[in-house]
Amino acid sequence: MSRLLKYFVLSLGLVATSAFADNVRIGFVTTLTTPAGAMGRDMVDAANIALDHIGHKMGGKAVEFIVEDDGFKPEIGKQKTDKLVKQDDVHFVTGFIWSHVLLASRKSALDGGKFLISANAGPSPLAGKLCHKNFFSSSWQNDQNPMATGEVLNKKGVKKLYIMSPNYAAGKNMVAGVERTFKGEIVGKDMTKWGKDMQLDFSAELAKAKVSGADAIFVFYPGPAGPAFIKQYDQAGLRGKIPLYTVFTVDALSLGRLQKAKLGGVLGSWNTMFWAPDLDNPTNKRFVADFKAKTGRYPTHYAAQSYDAIMLIKSGVDAVNGDTSNQDGIRAAMLKADFPSVRGKYRYGSNHFPIQNFYLRTVKEDANGDWFVSHVSTVLSDHQDSYHGQCKL
């Protein structure tokens, strides 16, 4: 077997190629290895479903989809972005789970004259002083979901809050978000170690929360830290005593593991998000049904954002009939957000971050007994991030 053939076999469908030199080339940087790899695979699965839905064509041209693994490390993310820009000469770079990886990689894409579209990470600098005409988000700015949670806490009558979050860029944004809207007293706050040697033992922090007098606990623990925290929250006997509110901690990936472990403490917990798998619109219904049929699980928000990133790119390329050199035309079309989004209609602010609704969601069982996150109500309508005023576009 030739080296080239082996490469395509081993890629397991992560790279879709075209024989045409003038195709539309999209680079996708995400985490596929390490315990966080499940999140990246969710994103790639959704992007491939989006490509299936559009026949792998944009503006009449075939799409080449090139996936790179950042290994959960900013320096590798930058290297892979450099490769996509300089070697593969992609037209668009998207993906990016982690804020520190995106911040390390952004100049490689933008200085290289490419469109950069974050399908997850939303660090505050990119919404403010580091905004760029060729940067777009198909997700949210980091502060927004926790800002919605703060409003929920106020409506629920919470007066005293205990906060836990990893100590990195996104974690700091999440804490800033809930602190911006929560009107009560923060009785404790722990910023735990993140990265290669992330902290997964929260017994000391939970012991402090237990005696803090808190009415609720707010946490942000994405990836493998989420199930670890939920398990220990359950074991600490806090279920039914101190209600749990989360952002980016409880999703379809973690719920599958939690249900197998019979950790019922997560049932009835609350979180906020711009999207839910049971949002009632035709695009979302098709996306969720096809994702479940292909993977056997509910999609996460990571998947939803990745699906929308592909559709956003298509809206731009279609508008210029496949002429990827017409960046002004592509940019103008993408700014309209005129495509069928899984979240329903939204619009872009001057900093190219979505202005959109945020919803309260709860964890419950579906008709088949599977745990999932379900839409409850709208918390924030047409919400714009807090940093757009710093953007000079």
Regions found by a protein language model. Name each.
Residues 79, 124-127, 132-236, 277-286:
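Extracellular/periplasmic Venus flytrap/periplasmic-binding protein
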Residues 70, 117, 124-127, 239-259, ...:
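Venus flytrap/periplasmic-binding-protein-like
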Residues 84, 88-97, 117-119, 160-165, ...:
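Periplasmic-binding protein-like
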Residues 17-21:
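Sec/Tat signal peptide C-region and signal peptidase I cleavage site
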Residues 27-46, 68-75, 97-98, 164-172, ...:
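Extracytoplasmic "Venus flytrap"
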Residues 233-307, 318-324, 363, 367, ...:
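Extracellular/periplasmic periplasmic-binding protein-like sensory domains
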Residues 7-16:
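Bacterial N-terminal signal peptides
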Residues 38-45, 53, 57-126, 138, ...:
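Beta-alpha junction/loop-to-helix N-cap segments that form part of ligand/metal-binding clefts
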